[in-house]
């Protein structure tokens, strides 16, 4: 037990230690200050600026930035959809896999362009190497870069600067942050045992009978794996994601993945502190998601260590670790930490089956998806956190009779409406409406578990899509037959069609509506004239205000989603307790 807790503590300490250094580096990149990569990147970026037609790095308004995001993402999505749809006749397809069904192709394209990487397919039987490398790999960089660019634009606006230029921010995010770290990380993963090959499946004799053979899937995994984690993408090369020994063979690779997942979203808060020239406030704000993250990790780890008490009572033991759905090489501690990390950061990669988590883990992972700020998605998570902070400023100002201001700029009706729209409307609608429809029509469901856990499966699917996370409780009939099976006569199902199309709604609504609202909010803040601080100004860089902000986050999250949590993991926990009695 002690060893498991030490593993968790050391991982968190590593993340906390690198946050200020990486956060300061990202600030230098986007404030266009000198970095070590300038001699190489300046030339490459100049060529790319010329190619995309960026002249003079002109600043964009909120609407211009939003349109640039939408147009570029739409073009990329069309290209990738065409590539996957034509993979049967394209190169790098050693197993001759034909194109997937149109709804699987559509869902996959939208899922990866929104940085969700929700997968209703098995990578080794559905996509060619070309689709994985040229299509999904390309989207992993551009979707992560898009989120990071939006987060930086929001920080600029919040601190009174112009929003910047989307194309410049996207290119700098890729060339100076995502690509260099991915190159180094991929080399480290290859050295640690992650394969990187264009050869087809390995045909080997089985252990039981040397006269029989088996096909072992492999491929260019290492370079795919590192951007999967660093960009908070989460989509696996194989069906079992990072539980697969080729994606995550040992404890060292697992640690690299955890650090990669957490590095950008945690450091971006410190980046804000550099932009605002207020590192004290950044450190205090950092404590909010860090505290919630540690709390959820402890809750999940305790549940997995104690196991299912109903099963334990039948076995006649007081405690037995819940090893269902877990890899023995990672154990209960790393599985719990990874589950909380991947849902807190909207990465979505998994090393254990979330469907097999105890109710503690189900509560923690669902809560992360509902809140979206522990530490949140690539760039957008930090922006969501500050949207909560703006609401906290407004509420606190009304309570104490002081002018609601943030960084010397008044918080007025427009800011409150946009922040409330983000938190109280878009996310719940994208989750609860399709969830209600799925539960109301049995033909759509394909749910493997009745009762409370089945409800959690359905809501988790849409919460994961709306939060751009991509992980799943699974247990749903959301996968069409593999392309080779369809070619052999298997029929696509209406259940999988429903899940693919309804999840697309949640993916798009949960990605682009919040991005537009965040950019408009930031644009409005950037245009406000700063007001000199007076004795009536509410200070936002104090421990008291930080505590109030944490309270606002928990209260708003509880008010919106507590009924779902009560009918899902909380009710499931009481059900297990009743079985013991």
Swiss-Prot record:
Q: Where are the transmembrane segments?
A: 2-22, 74-94, 135-155, 177-197, 255-275, 284-304, 332-352, 357-377, 381-401, 421-441, 501-521, 550-570
What keyword terms does UniProt attach to this protein? Answer: Cell inner membrane, Cell membrane, Ion transport, Membrane, Potassium, Potassium transport, Transmembrane, Transmembrane helix, Transport
Report the leader peptide range. Answer: none
Where, subcellularly, is it found? Cell inner membrane
Q: How does it sit in the membrane?
A: Multi-pass membrane protein
Q: Name one GO cellular component term.
A: plasma membrane
- Enumerate the GO terms in the molecular function aspect: P-type potassium transmembrane transporter activity; potassium ion binding
Where is it chiefly localized? membrane
Reading the lineage from the top rank, the first entry is: Bacteria
Alphabetical list of NCBIfam families matching this protein: kdpA
Q: What does this protein do?
A: Part of the high-affinity ATP-driven potassium transport (or Kdp) system, which catalyzes the hydrolysis of ATP coupled with the electrogenic transport of potassium into the cytoplasm. This subunit binds the periplasmic potassium ions and delivers the ions to the membrane domain of KdpB through an intramembrane tunnel.
Family listed: Belongs to the KdpA family.
Q: How does it assemble?
A: The system is composed of three essential subunits: KdpA, KdpB and KdpC.
HAMAP family the UniProt entry points to: KdpA
Q: What is this protein called?
A: Potassium-transporting ATPase potassium-binding subunit
Gene for this protein? kdpA
């Amino acid at each position: 037990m002690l060893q498991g807790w030490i593993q968790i503590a050391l991982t968190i300490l590593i993340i906390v230690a690198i946050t200020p250094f990486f956060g300061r580096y990202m600030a230098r990149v986007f404030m266009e200050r000198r970095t070590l990569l300038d001699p190489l990147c300046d030339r490459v970026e100049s060529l790319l600026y010329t190619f995309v037609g960026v002249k003079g790095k002109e600043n964009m308004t909120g609407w211009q930035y939003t349109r640039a995001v939408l147009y570029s993402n739409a073009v990329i999505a069309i290209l990738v959809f065409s590539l996957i749809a034509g993979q049967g006749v394209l190169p790098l397809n050693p197993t001759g896999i034909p194109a997937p069904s149109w709804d699987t192709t559509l869902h996959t394209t939208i899922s990866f362009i929104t940085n969700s990487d929700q997968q209703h397919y098995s990578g080794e039987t559905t996509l060619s190497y070309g689709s994985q490398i040229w299509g999904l790999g390309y989207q992993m960089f551009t979707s992560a870069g898009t989120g990071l660019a939006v987060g930086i634009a929001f920080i600029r606006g919040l601190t009174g600067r112009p929003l910047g230029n989307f194309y410049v921010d996207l290119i700098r995010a890729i060339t100076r942050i995502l690509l260099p770290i991915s190159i180094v990380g991929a080399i480290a993963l290859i050295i640690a045992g992650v394969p990187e090959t264009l050869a087809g499946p390995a045909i080997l004799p089985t252990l039981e009978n040397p006269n029989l053979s088996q096909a072992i899937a492999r491929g260019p995994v290492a370079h795919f794996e590192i951007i999967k984690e660093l960009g908070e993408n989460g989509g696996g090369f194989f069906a079992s994601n990072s539980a697969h020994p080729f994606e995550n063979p040992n404890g060292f690779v697992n640690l690299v993945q955890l650090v990669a997942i957490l590095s950008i979203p945690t450091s971006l808060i410190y980046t804000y502190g550099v932009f605002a020239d207020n590192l004290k406030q950044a450190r205090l704000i950092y404590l909010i998601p860090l505290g919630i993250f540690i709390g959820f990790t402890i809750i999940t780890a305790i549940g997995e260590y104690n196991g299912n008490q109903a099963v334990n009572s039948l076995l006649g033991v007081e405690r037995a670790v819940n090893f269902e759905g877990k890899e023995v090489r990672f154990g209960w501690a790393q599985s719990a930490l990874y589950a909380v990390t991947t849902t807190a950061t909207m990465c979505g990669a998994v090393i254990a089956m979330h469907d097999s988590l105890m109710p503690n883990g189900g509560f923690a992972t669902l809560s992360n998806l509902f809140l979206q700020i522990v530490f949140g998605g690539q760039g957008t998570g930090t922006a969501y956190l500050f949207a909560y902070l703006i609401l906290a400023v407004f509420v606190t100002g009304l309570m104490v009779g002081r002018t609601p201001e943030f960084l010397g700029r008044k918080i007025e009706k427009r800011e409150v409406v946009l922040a409330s729209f983000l938190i109280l409307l878009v996310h719940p609608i994208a989750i609860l409406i399709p969830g209600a429809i799925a539960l109301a029509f049995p033909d759509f469901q394909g749910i493997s578990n009745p009762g409370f856990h089945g409800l959690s499966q359905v809501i988790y699917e849409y919460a994961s899509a709306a939060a751009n996370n991509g992980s799943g409780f699974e247990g749903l009939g959301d996968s069409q037959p593999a392309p080779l099976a369809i070619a052999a006569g298997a029929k696509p199902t209406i259940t999988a069609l429903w899940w693919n199309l309804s999840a697309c709604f949640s993916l798009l609504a949960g990605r682009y509506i919040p991005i537009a609202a965040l950019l408009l909010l930031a644009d409005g803040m950037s245009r406000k004239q700063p007001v000199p601080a007076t004795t009536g100004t509410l200070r936002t860089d104090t421990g008291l205000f930080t505590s109030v902000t944490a309270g606002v986050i928990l209260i708003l999250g509880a008010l919106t989603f507590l009924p779902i949590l009560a009918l899902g993991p909380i009710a499931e926990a009481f059900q297990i307790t009743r079985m013991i009695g």
